[in-house]
Amino acid sequence: MIRKLIVKFALIATLLSAWGCALPQEGLLPKVEIPAVPLAAELKSSVSFTISFLPPPAAEAEQKLVEEFIQEFERANLFRMISSAPTAADVHMTVVLTQAVAVTPKHFALYLATGGLSPIRVPCIYELHAEIRSCLGKEVKYDIKDEVSKMVWAPGWPPGVDWHIDPTSSSVRRNLYRTLMMQMHRDGFLHHCGE
């Protein structure tokens, strides 16, 4: 009986510590929906990008993260083409997405006070830094930030950063990408430069 209880507790603690950098909740950034922009295909701009992630994820996770980025840009239907650099395009983007767990002394004190037996919610911060350059020479830098929470138990202390492809983390990243696209739209990066 006690052995089953210990096994269940260990399983739950392991699952919670391996959950990643998000809980089933929305981030703090307002959820963005891309409106339908009535542009003819020949008027849409093409995009060439480089994207990196900090801290660097494992190769398989990085491939999934890049696919997620491309899918969100394709789903928006705002661009004629999106491809990784170096490709001739109307818009060139350099994107860096960082993820960090912001543990404060308060979190550590709470962890010590509970003896690691109580889950502690710590903030996980996503920051998207993008440098956008159009073929007309216009350059803009964007810094977009969002935050979600991570539950930490004794086996998960100190909390680290893992790039998980779970639905909540993915939702937060995708919303960052949509926010970037809306800011690009506002700043006039959606039109084809012409020949």
For every predicted segment, state its role.
Residues 27-29, 123-127, 131, 139-195:
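C-terminal/domain-edge helix-coil "capping" segments
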Residues 42-44, 88, 121-123:
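Short coil/turn motifs at beta-sheet boundaries
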Residues 1-21:
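Sec-dependent bacterial lipoprotein signal peptides
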Residues 46-49, 83-105, 177:
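A short, hydrophobic beta-strand-centered structural micro-motif
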Residues 53-55, 97-99, 132-134, 145-148:
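A mature extracytoplasmic/lumenal domain signature
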Residues 20-78, 83, 189-195:
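A structural "domain/chain start" motif
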Residues 94-140, 162:
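Surface-exposed short loop/turn segments
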Residues 80-82, 86, 117-118:
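Short aromatic-glycine motifs in intrinsically disordered, low-complexity regions
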